[in-house]
């Protein structure tokens, strides 16, 4: 009996150790000179923290953004549940903003009433081919309506091509909105995001470095362009 108990305890402890080894936790924060998202200007200097846990391709990520230079910038808190297998990934994101036109003027997080919420729910699917990654996103619930009050199902598609040049990691991105959308300020199909980003690790010590990145982003639809500088802090 004693041997059986010891064997059972050993199996439990080994299983727990294995689960701990397979569970991945991410804690990091980006500081950016301006918050540019899919070709849209969403604020000035911002701190953008991330907390994520992952297990065998399944991950839950909390992401936020808060203005540093301008305290009236919109605060954002997003939750994403995603699954990746091979090059395929699918996910659902709950976006929340403390300010939202047509939403809750009091900025309450736990208010989900139709036509009075500051949440937007988005589904995505994508595939990473290695030489390029394709992603498609569509809003399916929350504060996303046409001017006549019907659901808009605002969508966005983008292709990202990574490459390396002069010991620097680069990505080239082209994104488009396929139809009219109040959220993306489009009246039909429109290219809304053309971006080029460079990232290089700045070594601080032998065991610690800070990724520094710069990005040129343009929105052909709104005829605006942006230059963003930022860095990432991650233990």
Where in this protein do the model-derived segments appear?
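Residues that define the transmembrane beta-barrel architecture of outer-membrane proteins
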Residues: 23-25, 43-47, 73-77, 117-121, ...
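Cleavable N-terminal export/targeting peptides
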Residues: 1-24
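Outer-membrane beta-barrel initiation region
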Residues: 20-53
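Transmembrane beta-strand segments that form the barrel wall of outer-membrane beta-barrel proteins
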Residues: 28-35, 58-68, 90-98, 107, ...
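Outer-membrane beta-barrel "beta-signal"
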Residues: 196, 202, 223-235
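Outer membrane beta-barrel transmembrane domains
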Residues: 169-204, 213
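Short loop/turn motifs that connect adjacent beta-strands in outer-membrane beta-barrel proteins
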Residues: 19-24, 91, 162-171, 199-212
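Detector for outer-membrane/organellar transmembrane beta-barrel domains
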Residues: 110-181, 234
């Amino acid at each position: 009996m004693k041997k059986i108990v010891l064997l059972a305890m050993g199996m439990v402890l080994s299983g727990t150790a294995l689960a701990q080894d397979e569970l991945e936790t991410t804690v990091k924060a980006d500081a950016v000179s301006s918050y540019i998202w899919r070709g849209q200007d969403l604020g000035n200097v911002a701190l953008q923290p991330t907390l994520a846990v992952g297990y065998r391709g399944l991950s839950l990520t909390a992401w936020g953004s808060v203005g540093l230079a301008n305290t009236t910038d919109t605060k954002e808190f997003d939750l994403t549940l995603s699954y990746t297998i091979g090059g395929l990934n699918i996910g659902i994101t709950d976006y929340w903003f403390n300010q939202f036109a047509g939403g809750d003027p009091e900025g309450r997080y736990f208010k989900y009433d139709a036509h009075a919420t500051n949440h937007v729910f988005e589904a995505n699917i994508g595939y990473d081919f290695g030489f390029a990654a394709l992603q498609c996103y569509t809003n399916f619930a929350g504060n996303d309506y046409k001017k006549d009050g019907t659901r808009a199902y605002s969508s966005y598609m983008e292709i990202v091509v990574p490459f390396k040049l002069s010991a620097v990691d680069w990505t080239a991105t082209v994104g488009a909105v396929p139809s009219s959308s109040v959220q993306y300020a489009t009246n039909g199909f429109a290219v809304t995001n053309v971006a080029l980003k460079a990232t290089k690790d700045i070594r601080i010590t032998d065991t610690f470095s800070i990724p520094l990145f710069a990005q040129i982003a343009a929105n052909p639809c709104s005829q605006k362009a942006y230059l963003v500088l930022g860095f990432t802090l991650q233990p």
